From Swiss-Prot:
GO terms for cellular component: adherens junction; cell projection; cytoplasm; cytoskeleton; focal adhesion. Residues 369-381, 600-615 have a biased composition (Basic and acidic residues). Residues 335-347, 356-368, 382-405, 432-476, 631-640 have a biased composition (Polar residues). It comes from Rattus norvegicus. Phosphorylated by ROCK, leading to activate the RacGAP activity. Residues 617-630 have a biased composition (Low complexity). The lineage of its organism: Eukaryota, Metazoa, Chordata, Craniata, Vertebrata. This is Rho GTPase-activating protein 24. Transmembrane segments: none annotated. Rho GTPase-activating protein involved in cell polarity, cell morphology and cytoskeletal organization. Acts as a GTPase activator for the Rac-type GTPase by converting it to an inactive GDP-bound state. Controls actin remodeling by inactivating Rac downstream of Rho leading to suppress leading edge protrusion and promotes cell retraction to achieve cellular polarity. Able to suppress RAC1 and CDC42 activity in vitro. Overexpression induces cell rounding with partial or complete disruption of actin stress fibers and formation of membrane ruffles, lamellipodia, and filopodia. InterPro entries: PH-like_dom_sf, PH_domain, Rho_GTPase_activation_prot, RhoGAP, RhoGAP_dom. The modification Phosphothreonine is found at residue 452. The record marks 174 as: Arginine finger. Residues 328-476, 582-640 are annotated as: Disordered. It is found in: Cytoplasm, Cytoskeleton; Cell junction, Adherens junction; Cell junction, Focal adhesion; Cell projection.
Length: 748
């Protein structure tokens, strides 16, 4: 009863060589509703039926667009009838090409289901439905309008639901789901609907739906042509595993793109499922037993072939699940998601770097040239506390390495206190930059928080703190001292325990001990950190004999932020973003940098008093060193400006690329919109024509009914006239006979 009409073996099938399906069905028709056996051919969006298989002229045609297919359950009275009906669409305002229903009967249940699936695929295919039994490349081609995907949306939806709710479900993929629910979901997807799974949906039902989709693909994920090649890989695996894996990788790469992507997606998901085998009892072998026949199956499914290949297929599928990292390398993974822009904030995207990775990057950090993004975290406990007792060491030597001395002062009178928080990561040789503050810790792991009183910045400030407008450039740290925005005892006496700091490309900081330690009297000879992008500046100390080589690294981002304490009364916003124009255009006061080289502070009050005195006498010190500052800064300005120009040009190029990409997308969407509008206009015109036809047919039907009523009336009148005629004719014939009998002459 069922045939695929793709071949042209007999001459009569040449006109139907592009038919999707053909076979014998029984059709109910005529006024008496009798059953007639007809040869049906499904071609395009039309279902033709012929009197015989060899006929070329169809007896009729059913136009499928706008219709729907309904399956009739088997009745107990007629168990041998497998009925389905093609009826017009359920919407009243939706007119179809034919205004009548067709009741068809198949010989078997499987035959009926195949016909229903094929007809639904034709009806709902243009609307994204009919995916069960549809070719994989056709499904992927249609879903490309929604973006590039590794797997069809049905597979992704099932996998995402199982990831969320079913990875720990015992017997996953082994226990069957509810058959009626699976059937309902299948019909919904085939009708172009997109049903969503909620918390009440059974996990086993969704798993059964996924297996059903893979099982009903016209050609499995591994095509029929590759079946024998994959089986040979399994044979090679049993002899020599390494050679077998290489051959299997070669065969996997030779698959079509859509098949390769789907196989990779499924194998990675199944590997994730088997990682929970201690809970769900589904090991790689069990999953291979379930999915093997759906992924790898022969074209001719005779019992002997299936029996011979079952064990081999299970072994091969188990290898593909457990060794999917080698079979599907990540470097060949297509980009299915848009890349993040250079200014995107990826706070949640950064993975924590292990200690070994930090040390490896620390040893090679001078060779790190790519510009990376830096992640900023909100300070955990911005509390006010007194500074540690100690004597801060002021700067001595040249201060011309910073452009601060040749620009206007930055007014920070309204700035809330910044926070420098101790962090145990310093003991391990690493640190974290958090919203303009550097986290460190002492040897005892005591957590300390230091703030400046009255919301004013009265301490030394690095580029990462001072600029909250720092343009994320190259920072060189001399003699193992980290220049912080807030003074504490660790930076004064030990210079952060004699460790050198380097900024890694991912925004983290590593500290390590120097081989040489500077004398106590020279601990204050440091250079300011550079505030520019991608510029490796050379700094010189007053004493050239004490110069040490340090590591430098590059880190960059569009802007940096300083997080303000929530209990600050003077802050107007939670974060302050400082672009480069704020850095150059603002006024800045740094009494510590402008003060004398050596001062001792024992209490925060003394610190404030001395900083006030420095602010008075700082101008004279600036005047004496202005000539030195101008000479060095002129040389740095050109390189800094060139670096900024290169950064701006690269950002402009990136913006141009994004603009071109967005414009192309907009044009494609506009073109698609015009196409859809044209289709809508055509459909409206067709709808109007069909309505007019329907109106004409209604008029004809009413005329026919009136003519029928008139004919019945005439028939009644004729019937009465005939009865009267026969009754009158009978009376006329009976009376003459009676008169003749009365005139009889008797002869004796």
């Amino acid at each position: 009863m069922e045939e695929n009409c793709d071949s042209t073996e007999n001459p009569h099938s040449q006109g139907r060589q592009n038919a999707t399906k053909c076979g014998w069905l029984r059709k109910q028709g005529g006024f008496v509703k009798t059953w007639h056996t007809r040869w049906f051919v499904l071609k395009g969006d039309q279902l033709h039926y012929f009197k015989d298989e060899d006929e070329t002229k169809p007896l009729g045609t059913i136009f499928l667009p706008g219709n729907k297919v309904i399956e009739h359950p088997c009745n107990e009275e007629s168990p041998g009838k497998f009925l389905f009906e093609v009826v017009p669409g359920g919407e009243r305002d939706r007119m179809t090409a034919n205004h009548e229903s067709y009741l068809l009967m198949a010989s078997t249940q499987n035959d009926m289901e195949d016909w229903v699936k094929s007809i639904r695929r034709v009806i709902w295919g243009p609307f994204g439905g009919g995916i069960f039994g549809q070719k994989l490349e056709d499904t992927v081609r249609y879903e490309k309008r929604y973006g590039n995907r590794l797997a069809p949306m049905l597979v992704e939806q099932c996998v995402d639901f199982i990831r969320q709710r079913g990875l720990k479900e015992e017997g996953l993929f082994r226990l069957p789901g509810q058959a009626n629910l699976v059937k309902e979901l299948q019909d919904a997807f085939d009708c172009g609907e997109k049903p969503s799974f909620d918390s009440n949906t059974d996990v086993h039902t969704v798993a059964s739906l996924l297996k059903l989709y893979l099982r009903e693909l016209p050609e499995p994920v591994v095509p029929y042509a590759k079946y024998e090649d994959f089986l040979s890989c399994a044979t090679l695996l049993s002899k020599e595993e390494e050679a077998g894996v290489k051959e299997l990788t070669k065969q996997v790469k030779s698959l079509p793109v859509v098949n390769y992507n789907l196989l990779k997606y499924i194998c990675r998901f199944l590997d994730e499922v088997q990682s929970y085998s201690g809970v769900n009892k589904m090991s790689a072998q069990n999953l291979a037993t379930v999915f093997g026949p759906n992924i790898l199956r022969p074209k001719v499914e005779d019992p002997l072939t299936i029996m011979e290949g079952t064990v081999v297929v299970q072994q091969l599928m188990s290898v593909m699940i457990s060794k999917h990292d080698r079979l599907f390398p990540k470097d060949t993974e297509p980009q299915s998601k848009p890349q993040e822009g250079p200014n995107s904030n990826n706070n949640d995207g950064h993975k924590k770097v292990t200690m070994g990775q930090l040390q490896n990057k620390e040893n090679n950090n001078t060779k790190e040239s790519p510009v990376r993004r830096c992640s900023w975290d909100k300070p955990e406990s911005p509390q006010r506390s007194s500074m540690d007792n100690g004597s801060p060491t002021a700067l001595s030597g040249s201060k011309t390495n910073s452009p601060r001395n040749s620009i206007h002062k930055l007014d920070v009178s309204r700035s809330p206190p910044l926070t420098v928080k101790k962090n145990p990561a310093f003991n391990k040789g690493s640190g974290i930059v958090t919203n303009g503050s550097f986290s460190s810790s002492n040897a005892e792991g005591v957590e300390k928080t230091q703030t400046t009183p009255n919301g004013s910045l009265q301490a030394r400030r690095t580029s990462s703190l001072k600029s909250s407008g720092t343009k994320m450039g190259t920072h060189s740290v001399q003699n193992g001292t980290v220049r912080m925005g807030i003074l504490n005892t660790d930076t004064l006496g030990n210079s952060l325990n004699g460790r050198s700091m380097s900024w890694l490309p991912n925004g983290y900081v590593t500290l390590r001990d120097n081989k040489q330690k500077e004398p106590a009297g020279e601990s204050g000879q440091h250079n300011r950190l550079s505030t520019y992008d991608n510029v490796h500046q050379q700094f010189s100390l007053m004493n050239l004999d004490d110069k040490h080589s340090v590591d430098s690294a590059t880190w960059s981002t569009s802007s940096c932020e300083i997080s303000l304490p929530e209990n600050s009364n003077s802050c107007r916003s939670s974060t302050t973003t400082c672009p480069e124009q704020d850095f150059y255009g603002g006024n800045f006061e740094d009494p510590v940098l402008d003060g004398p080289p050596q001062d001792d502070l024992s209490h925060p009050g003394d610190y404030e008093n001395k900083s006030d005195r420095r602010s008075v006498g700082g101008r004279s010190s600036r005047a004496t060193s202005s000539s030195d500052n101008s000479e060095t800064f002129v040389g740095n300005t050109s390189s800094n400006h060139s670096a900024l120009h290169s950064l701006v040009s690269s950002l402009k190029q990136e913006m141009t690329k994004q603009k071109i990409e967005y414009e192309s997308r907009i044009k494609s969407l506009e073109q698609r919109n015009l196409t859809l509008e044209t289709e809508m206009l055509n459909l409206h015109d067709e709808l109007d024509q069909e309505r007019k036809k329907f109106t004409m047919i209604e008029i004809k039907m009413r005329n026919a009914e009136r003519a029928k009523e008139d004919a019945e009336k005439r028939n009644d009148m004729l019937q009465k006239e005939m009865e009267q005629f026969f009754s009158t004719f009978g009376d006329l014939t009976v009376e003459p006979r009676r008169s003749e009998r009365g005139n009889t002459i008797w002869i004796q």
